[in-house]
Swiss-Prot record:
Subcellular location per the Swiss-Prot or TrEMBL entry: Mitochondrion matrix
The organism's place on the tree of life at top rank: Eukaryota
Gene3D superfamilies: Flavinator of succinate dehydrogenase
Source organism phylogeny: Eukaryota, Metazoa, Chordata, Craniata, Vertebrata
Role description: Plays an essential role in the assembly of succinate dehydrogenase (SDH), an enzyme complex (also referred to as respiratory complex II) that is a component of both the tricarboxylic acid (TCA) cycle and the mitochondrial electron transport chain, and which couples the oxidation of succinate to fumarate with the reduction of ubiquinone (coenzyme Q) to ubiquinol. Required for flavinylation (covalent attachment of FAD) of the flavoprotein subunit SDHA of the SDH catalytic dimer.
Keywords noted in UniProt: Chaperone, Mitochondrion, Transit peptide
Main localisation: mitochondrion
Annotated GO biological process: canonical Wnt signaling pathway; epithelial to mesenchymal transition; mitochondrial electron transport, succinate to ubiquinone; negative regulation of canonical Wnt signaling pathway; negative regulation of epithelial to mesenchymal transition; protein-FAD linkage
Listed name of the protein: Succinate dehydrogenase assembly factor 2, mitochondrial
Organism: Mus musculus (Mouse)
Length: 164
């Protein structure tokens, strides 16, 4: 009998205090979709200022190649990890110092990895400063004309193979 009288009392207490009136201490959350739709105002985005890119002039060419190989493999998104690491495997060892500097600028100056991906796949035009021979090489590489399977970054064993 006590349980039967408790339930209506509990129901009245809950309906009066928590279900019908909002609690002042509860914060409501909203989800934002961050897409690149034409109506996206980007007011929900916070831009974090990054220090400007600076060319490393005190670096040997071997050190630069090693750093660029590492930076090509360790990106902020899987798509660029795969694309840039395979590109680096194919081209980095034959690049001139000028091309290495262009590639360094390309992968390190933009603050958004998606921009690099969109430029390489020609989904968006690249800014004039990045329109150069290295960007052309990257775009051609991204087309994958040989229809290679590109599902992951390459293993590093190729670095230890003797040149043919």
């Amino acid at each position: 009998m006590a349980v039967v009288t408790l339930i209506p009392t509990l129901a009245r207490a809950l309906s009066k205090h928590s279900l019908l009136s909002p609690l002042p201490s509860v914060t409501s959350f909203r989800r934002f979709y961050r897409g690149d739709s034409p109506t996206d105002s980007q007011k929900d985005m916070i831009e974090i200022p990054l220090p400007p890119w600076q060319e490393r002039t005190d670096e040997s060419i071997e050190t630069k190649r090693a750093r660029l190989l590492y930076e090509s493999r360790k990106r902020g998104m899987l798509e660029n990890c795969i694309l840039l690491s395979l590109f680096a495997k194919e081209y980095l060892h034959n690049m001139t110092e000028k091309q290495l500097n262009l590639y360094d600028r390309l992968i390190n100056e933009p603050s958004n990895d998606w921009d690099i991906y969109y430029w390489a796949t020609e989904a968006k035009p690249a800014p004039e400063i990045f329109e150069n021979e290295v960007m052309e090489l990257l775009r051609e590489f991204a087309k994958n004309k040989n229809k290679e399977q590109r599902l992951r970054a390459p293993d590093l064993e190729y670095l230890f193979e003797k040149p043919h």
